[in-house]
Amino acid sequence: MVKKQSNMKEEQTLHALAREGNLRTLPEAEHDGVWIGQDGRRMLNVASNDYLGLASDRGLQEEFLRSVPERDRLLSASSSRLLTGNFAVHRELEALLAGRFGRESALTFSSGYHLNMGILPAVADGHTLILADKLVHASLIDGIRLSAARCIRYRHQDYRQLQSLVEKHHAAFDRLIIVTESVFSMDGDVAPLAALAELKKAYPNVMLYVDEAHAVGVRGKRGLGIAEEQGCLADIDFLCGTFGKALASVGAYVVCSRLMHDYLVNRMRTLIFTTALPPLNVAWTKFVFSRLDGWEDRRIRLASMAEKVRGAVRRAGYPCPSESHIVPLVVGESEKTVLKAAEMQQNGFYILPVRPPTVPEGTSRLRLSLTAALPEAEVERLVEAIEAPSTLSEGGI
């Protein structure tokens, strides 16, 4: 049988990915609180973004279901927000967000990907220069690519290079937009947002876009993220975050000026041309966010746990740039990283390998993603497993 010529490219790509140890498949697993069941094994889930442990908190969910009003018990908005999908609970959540962050307005979206892929094309035209950290998330990269702006990627966390680029280019463009994450999703390090805000304020045509996806809920006295922690909530033009991680829900948000809110409603394609979030999910997000400042004990516990695990990774001899609850164990080669992940799973820890193109070549890693719900005894066992000599052959890791 002659192979269809039209499929050869895809087949060759998959074979190449398999040879390089980078072929992905969708994992099948059963969830039970902080535990994962897979292939007959019960493993501690150290790969989840449920940073505060709210997604596995059945008591909290039952409290919500008892209290949610009938008007919000809708499983679909059935329309774009600009048609018939703009429910009262959407507006209430946005008012709550704006009030907590001390900003004029907030706007919510169906996902963090929609958020990052939509704002930059809406606000960055051909007279705009975007200065983006080298390691920003794929959704931000795609948003930059869809925009008409010119883009320069500055070296990761290199403030001096960024400062030099702003000084060099600010007069040549109508607008410069600095784009960064606050807690970086793969290294777990933290951006100097206060310094970036001061740099922005020195130039009237410079704006600051910050993605707090991995920080909101977890960092800051009230759980409002690194911007709260560093005292610059009011200085960030586009302060973005997600509901799908620490807040245990779905969707995303930006807090901004009223002018920018109204502009995005009129020009942001990923808001205009998509179905709004279901009212029931929005009601859950509102329920969770309204209680966020009361979970400081969970944030403290998570920070303490992360410090222990970071110490274990460093004592085991692995590079670890983390300053947060995201703790990378950088192995290097993809095949060795897959083997290391298998070893950790054999020891009872559900940890997955992260490989190119998610991370640069030669930096494949295990990404330990910690949550406040992990039992103390299991965290101690995780520390011991990280520090223990490998049970694989010398050539395996």
Kindly give the residue locations of the regions a language model identified.
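Conserved PLP-anchoring active-site segment centered on the Schiff-base-forming lysine
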Residues: 119-138, 159
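Conserved N-terminal alpha-helix of the aminotransferase class I/II PLP-enzyme fold
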Residues: 62-112
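Conserved PLP-binding catalytic core of the aspartate aminotransferase-like
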Residues: 300-307, 314-348, 363, 370-372
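Active-site phosphate-binding strand-loop segment of PLP-dependent enzymes
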Residues: 50, 152, 156-210
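N-terminal "arm"/small-domain region of PLP-dependent enzymes with the aminotransferase-like
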Residues: 9-75, 206
